[in-house]
Amino acid sequence: MTSAVLRRQRRATFTVFLANGCGIGGWAAAIPELKRDLALGDGQLSLVLLAVALGAMLTMPFAGVLVPRLGGTGRLTRCSILAFVLVLSWPGAAPSLAWLLPCALLLGACNGLIDVAMNAHASDVESRWDGPLMSSFHAAFSLGGFLGAGLGALVLHLGASAFAVLLTAALVALVLALPAALALDEGDRSPVSHALRLPDRRVLALGLIALGCLMLEGAMTDWSAVYLDQVGGATPVVATLGYAAFSLTMLIGRLFGDGVRRRFGGPQVIFGGALLATLGLAVAVLLPAPWTAILGFALVGLGLSNVVPAAFSAAGQVAETPATGIAMTATAGYLGFLLGPPLIGAVAGQVGLRGSLLLLTLIGVAVALLALRQRKT
């Protein structure tokens, strides 16, 4: 493959991550307004988020089967990103919880496919590239999240509904995704279903690190705006800035992530990042006023920025094959991203949102301890 063609694949993959992040950012911005429009309680909202998680878990096991059937990771990425964009606005049009739950289930199903597909394709592109790329791809996702949340804040400022927020995010994501999806090559044709096999202890530890990290990231995606709204007393527009700050600092961290990992090493990056994220959560819990909580969420984003890329890179080195290790770690991390928000909602129903964030600090400490163990092995 010529360098020009490979650069084109890198740009296309980068843009797919960007489009997916934009959609997720729009979803994060729309959640408080959706909760308010349908008069949902914390427990009911946790059911909606659980439906998103369940939808993804139903489709993830089939990703490996679809790769060879569709002709490669690139083709699966193409189909799944377009499906994700198509259904993104549907939850905003739901007139009741009974309609919202199946829409959320379908959104989760499509997002589960695109998350597995684009990470598998990113791994294939990285294997053909001279140097690490994973942090830059995840930086694109963070940039998209910042873009989607920012657009959501603007639309809400104009007095629009949750449906308008999601539709705007979907249209922007479509403009980004369509040319990128058409530019993707076939990619790796081998199935990734072997990612569900029992991993060795090193890959298992990296999977747990990714699970904990993405559980925190999922909580920031789905609950940061709600926390600022209910606990901090922020206006709807200011409430969206929590996720925007989180995404912005995560983007900044990932832009420098490959160089930081080359200098300090993956385990050190994971350890320091987990501690910084824990500090940010503590700030948000102890100082819940809107601007101090937003500062805390920004620290969480900076801390988590390179944990997952570092875990993916390490898993690719210690597993039997790079694709196997990355797929195992990505699957564990994705489960954390999906299951974290409904878990936080369930805990919030018992002890409140501040208690839920306090629980997340323990997860941050656990990730740091796992990274410390990785440094010794």
Which functions belong to the PLM regions below?
Residues 59-72, 156, 253-265, 348:
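Helix-to-loop junctions at the C-terminal end of transmembrane segments
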Residues 29-43, 222-238:
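Short amphipathic helix-loop junctions that connect adjacent transmembrane helices
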Residues 112-127, 305-319:
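Intracellular juxtamembrane helix-capping segments at the cytosolic ends
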Residues 39, 71, 93-95, 233, ...:
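Helix-breaking motifs and short loop linkers at transmembrane-helix boundaries and internal kinks
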Residues 92-103, 286-295:
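Helix-loop junctions at membrane interfaces in 12-TM secondary transporters
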Residues 75-89, 98, 268-283:
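Structural signature of the two symmetry-related core transmembrane helices
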Residues 34-35, 66-67, 154-159, 228-229, ...:
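Interfacial helix-cap and linker-helix signal at transmembrane-aqueous boundaries
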Residues 137-185:
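Helix-loop-helix hairpin linking two adjacent transmembrane segments in secondary transporters
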